[in-house]
Amino acid sequence: VTRHVDGNLFWPSMSSDGKVIVYEELFGLWKLDVATGKTNEIKIEISADEKDNETDVETVTNEVDAFDLSPSGRRAVISARGQLFTIATDRGDITRLAADNQASRNQFPKWSADGKYIAYMSDKSGRDEIWISDPEGRSPKKITDLDNEKGAIVWTPDSKLLLYTAADKKLYSYGVADGKTMTVTSSDVNRIGSVAVSPDSKWVAFSKLDRTLRSHVYIAPIAGGEERHVSDDRLLYAESNAVWTADGRYLVFTSTEGFSNGIATQGGIGTTMALWALALQDQDRDPMNRDIDNEAQGLAAEAAARQAGGRGQAGAAAAAAVPDVRIDWGGLARRARQVTVPGTTIGALAPAPEGHAVALTASNGGGRGGGNDAAGGGMFVVDVESGQVTRVPPAPAAANEGRGGGGGGPAPAGAGAGIVFARDVRTLYFRSGAGLYAAPLAPNTNTAAGAAAGGAGRGGRGGRGAASAEVADASAAPAATARQVTYTVNLEVDRKALRAQVFNEGWRIMKNRFYDAKMHGANWNAVREMYEPLLENLVDEDELHTIMMMMIGHLNASHTGVSGGPNPMQAAVQTRYPGFDLVADASGYYKVGHIYKNGPADHDYFKIKPGDFIVSIDDHELKTSDNYWRYFTIAAGNKFHFLVNDRPARDGAWDVAITPAAGPAFADLQYARWVDERRDIVTKASNGEIGYLHIRAMDAPSLRQFQLDLAANRTKKALVIDQRFNGGGGIDQELLGILAGRQYQYTIGRDAGFQQPRPQNFYGPMVVMQNERSASDAEMFPAGFKALGLGKVVGVPTMGAVIGTGAYTLLDGSTIRTPASGVWTTTSQNMENYGVPPDVFIDNLPGDFLKGRDMQVEKAVEVLKADLAGRKPTTAQQ
């Protein structure tokens, strides 16, 4: 009924007499005369004063988005709230680097080894570029001019070159003296990953993906030349996060065994990660041989370690010497040695400034037991030669609390991002939550001298070929927790300028990260020009997010949006549930309705059953005229006290005290009831011959549940796989890999019946159910099911929301979703805005719902029964 050719139409509202519709169009109000079809803009002029002062002073305390240490370790450069500061690491004295006159975001600072320069990322020019300045922030110089994202800012140890990666899949070097930029290497697939420079500044190690999306570590001359893969594809599945040890003898990196998509793993088997050390030179002895075969040798090694612990001037001079890194390429890959037991997910790596130790972050990934799998997670220092592992004192428990507004940028992958050793090797600095912490290290934790003692074996002082790599006893740590590096600074905040910064930052991030460079046909520059003038009249962040959402809406894409920010919503009142439904009765009291299986009230020791009357709750008489929900808002851990009777009266009633369920737990109970009801429909309609399972989400827990449900249905003749109301995730390939299995044999043992060899597969007819609420990966799954010819799909077209998405934290702490990869079928169909069509179309209408029927499930059973009727039983089924 409207004919506008531009803008967006929002919030139509019809008058009570049905004659007029008022709506919002192109930032104005319009009126539609229903009878004539004519539209007219409603002119409104509102004069108002600003309700808040747009300029304010905020006190920022201890926030750190990113940091790096000065060469002396006495100061650190930090980024916070888009500004750069240097701070004394011992007393919190803080100095702001020269401030910009306009709102901008400066982040990811890196201090050169000679102390003369600080490099950082800044969007002060209108796009993310790399700048360098002196430590006071004077004479800033922009060294890049590329209209794309950059990352992995890394200084060479001699401070002559600055390396960085860019979204054009290249690794660049910038010469500080001559200002020349050169290409070091490039990738054919994606951006260069982690980057690390050798101690002599002659070599660079980096990771990049191959065509199968496996990450590999390479070494190349920093001046340019042949790059070499450091490992063997037959030995290691993937490598990344390479760092050089300070003595130049080892390249240390992480390696994974098996494939993981970040949500679940191939076949549901957990992917493991381990730390590996690659000896760069030929070795004339077994590195695992400690020559500690008796007590005397063990005591001598410990004495040598204690003597070296003081280090003194000679030790300092040795540490300052620059090693000449020599690489013996022959047999390089076979000199790789696993340092830690697989199972731990290893995060950042940082080399110690001397010797052959590295610091790392680790989280428990379910290792296969024993050894140094950093059980429980944390931060550790690992001597890659001796295998000694020492736990670093953690940040206090409150360290994870913070504003949550930092570090959302292009995630530099330089060595040791987030962990830095002090030059004296006595302190390790790291970020935790929103703060910066300093952890004291035990003597000989990470020096070459520390390795002289050998790895202390489990039963004594070690032995030949048995490096310990055990996590050190916590009592050896010099402090229970790390010390926070504290500071306080007052910042003047121009909220109008901040909103403009966030708007443009969000626009630029979508420009650089949206999976379709053509922006789904939208003129992205023109879109910004349409909405940017509105910034002048915005009054708060909610209005900012509204126009940003409208701007993003021009992309006509899913998995997008802006949320959160500096003014988080207050926590919602927690409603809790007793585990049964209340049904109004003519007596004026409520009756107990359905009791949820495995819920709070589903226990033999509770004297309560459907049909009982609830006379009161917590001494409040409960009548059908009362809103019982107000009594369901209680604190966690408290109990409901119900007065229950088998008749509508207090006389003879008894007390039932129930610990209620929180909202998410009750949602699980409701979901389980819904699944049971669908399963009952299938069982009754097929006389028990057809099985049923539902996939709630496309995540690891749902994959495990799917495998359990599949095993429970393995004796059924056919199977309904329901994935309606599934919001997606990333396990479609795992599911299809299981379902695509075909039976080619069976076994019969003596005095035993027919046995199927693989309970994790299903070999009978199958259908997949979908609806308009099946989204993202829950669309890729039925599309793959159809393409592989595994069976028919029943229901209605899916949502049409299939993009691989990420997220970016904007300067004000809000988050913008960034769809970075599209999905196409093998027939070149882009699945975004597509909607997978079913083979058999059937919808559930409101009338069916009111009658308690699920027509889609009934149709799925009908399809399978027809399939079964047309099949001949196999020998195994006869």
Segment roles from a protein language model:
Residues 12-19, 67-74, 108-117, 153-161, ...:
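Blade-terminus and WD-like Trp-Asp/Gly-His loop motifs, strongest in beta-propeller folds
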Residues 48-64, 325-342:
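A short helix->beta-strand "capping" segment at the edge of beta-propeller domains
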Residues 70-77, 82, 86-87, 331-390, ...:
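Long hydrophobic segments that form regular secondary structure
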Residues 302-321, 366-374, 399-412, 450-470:
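Disordered, low-complexity segments in secreted/periplasmic proteins that are enriched in proline
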Residues 594, 598-600, 615-811, 848-856, ...:
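Cleft-lining beta-strand/loop regions that shape enzyme active-site pockets
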